[in-house]
């Protein structure tokens, strides 16, 4: 499985899957359930599915994605699983610690990515920002998807400090749930 770290063979075998459940449109609604989303973003935001597909296509070339050996479909499914875990596909999601949007980017990270403050107003920037940041974490950890996810959640310094997934309950859960969701989407 993805969680085992031996992702090459798994990705090759799962990519052939074409069950109806793997279609992005069946996995989440195309309209944000947040009643304020329409006022905040209008119809320019497009569906969440379209945002994820477009962002994954535009970031698939990044070194971290290539280092992880992810095909375009695998990258989309990983990004989709991350967004499910981070926000349950809610555009205006805000965490108690200040992370915002579909990909729950902290303001400081958004600043580093050059998307602050625009990501507060544009869901596409939320998704591409999260995709770029995840690709950076994958690059930092030589394509190791589990370490990249742990770094996305707990920060790269913690992954380096512990030599892998930190012993934080939230991060331990995070690196289990996203691969499970990824495998569901890819199947």
Model-assigned labels for residue ranges:
Residues 34-43, 66-69, 91-96, 113-123, ...:
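Second-shell loop/turn segments in exported
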